């Protein structure tokens, strides 16, 4: 009996054990289901692959498109501008700064150099290609200011000067001149356009003689008298205007062969030569002395002025009136010391009233 009860109890225990085990198995899938669902969401990292595509490097390629800006900086082309602006008072635009010097003027027997004026006088004897004997003087002149090249009457007016010519050395001292030549003797005539130091002395048309005009910017012009009226000359607002001539060089600076003048034979000569604004020359040729200097005719004189490199040249009064004076002394030795009614001279700049 006891054995039967034990067997029944043992059988009941065995039936409960599989039931509990089955219950345990059925419960574990229920708890694992929510935990295994989470890993199925992990595929979200796949967008990170697309993020890599965003790292397309268009930004660096856009940067070079901004770099052309340096090509828009051609500022170096503006640097030449300062060199193109000469000082207003400099007639030759600063092309010859080496001919002047600062400080006190330096003077020798044949030269004068200051901050505003440079004069060098050369004596030329028997120039090649010209009759012998021949003596001439060339005064090379640079000025910074147009007021350094002036004219003067022997007296206060043109009319008074015609009746009372003066000695060149007296006029040099009166005008405080550095260098002086005789002028055009215009007081002898009653025609021609005459301007001295900006002041009009006469306004009469002159078809017979060439005119010479010095403008305020330093330019010197020689004009045909039969093609230029006094009104046209005065319209230029000249600093000086002379009436004698003839012009010795053509518009290209070459020697003329024909002249509107009766005084074409060998004679003492006085010439105003021109190179460029601010650069001029006074030329005096000795003459009428066979054993010293015969003088030049107009063809020879024009060739001589061309040989000096002048671009324009104008014949002034000549003969015994021709004279060159420097530093209070006559440089040329004219046959006679004829008085002159007007002169052309170089001085230090002056302020005009």
Regions flagged by a language model, labelled:
Residues 91-92, 96-98, 107-111, 120, ...:
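Active-site-adjacent helix-turn-beta-strand microarchitecture at beta-sheet edges
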Residues 15-18, 86-206:
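Zymogen propeptides
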Residues 15-89, 102:
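Ser/Thr-rich, Proline-interspersed low-complexity disordered segments
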Residues 142-145, 214-220, 251-252, 274-278, ...:
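Short acidic-glycine loop/turn motifs at beta-strand connectors
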Residues 9-12:
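C-terminal motif of bacterial Sec signal peptides marking the signal peptidase cleavage site
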Residues 189-207, 257-311, 321-353:
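Conserved, well-ordered active-site substructure
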Residues 1-3:
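Sec-dependent signal peptide recognition
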Residues 178-182, 212-214, 273, 281-283, ...:
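Structural recognition of the beta-strand scaffold that forms the well-ordered cores
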């Amino acid at each position: 009996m006891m054995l039967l009860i034990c067997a029944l109890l043992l059988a009941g225990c065995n039936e409960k054990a599989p039931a509990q085990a089955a219950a345990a198995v059925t419960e574990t899938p229920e708890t694992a289901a929510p935990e295994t669902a989470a890993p199925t969401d992990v595929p979200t990292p796949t967008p990170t692959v697309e993020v890599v595509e965003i790292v397309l490097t268009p930004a660096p390629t856009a940067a070079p498109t901004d770099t052309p800006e340096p090509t828009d900086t051609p500022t170096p082309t503006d640097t030449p501008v300062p060199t193109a602006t000469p000082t207003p008072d400099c007639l030759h635009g600063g092309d010859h700064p080496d001919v002047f010097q600062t400080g006190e003027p330096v003077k020798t027997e044949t030269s004068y150099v200051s901050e505003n004026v440079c004069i060098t006088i050369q004596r030329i004897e028997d120039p090649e290609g010209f009759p012998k004997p021949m003596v001439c003087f060339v005064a090379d002149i640079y000025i910074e200011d147009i007021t350094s090249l002036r004219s003067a009457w022997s007296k206060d007016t043109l009319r008074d000067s015609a009746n009372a010519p003066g000695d060149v050395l007296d006029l040099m001292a009166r005008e405080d001149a550095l260098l002086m030549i005789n002028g055009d003797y215009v007081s002898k005539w009653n025609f021609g356009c005459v301007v001295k130091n900006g002041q009009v002395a006469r306004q009469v048309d002159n078809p017979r003689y060439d005119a010479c005009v010095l403008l305020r910017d330093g330019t010197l012009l020689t004009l045909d008298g039969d093609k230029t009226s006094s009104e046209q000359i005065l319209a230029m607002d000249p600093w000086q205007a002379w009436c004698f001539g003839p012009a010795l060089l053509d518009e290209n600076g070459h020697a003329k062969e024909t002249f509107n003048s009766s005084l074409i034979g060998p004679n003492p000569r006085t010439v105003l030569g021109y190179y460029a604004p601010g650069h001029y020359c006074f030329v005096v040729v000795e003459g009428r002395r066979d054993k010293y200097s015969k003088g030049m005719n107009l063809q020879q004189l024009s060739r001589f002025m061309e040989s000096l490199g002048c671009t324009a040249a104008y014949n002034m009064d000549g003969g015994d009136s021709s004279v060159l004076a420097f530093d209070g002394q006559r440089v040329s030795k004219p046959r006679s010391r004829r008085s002159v009614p007007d002169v052309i001279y170089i001085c230090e700049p002056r302020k005009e009233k």
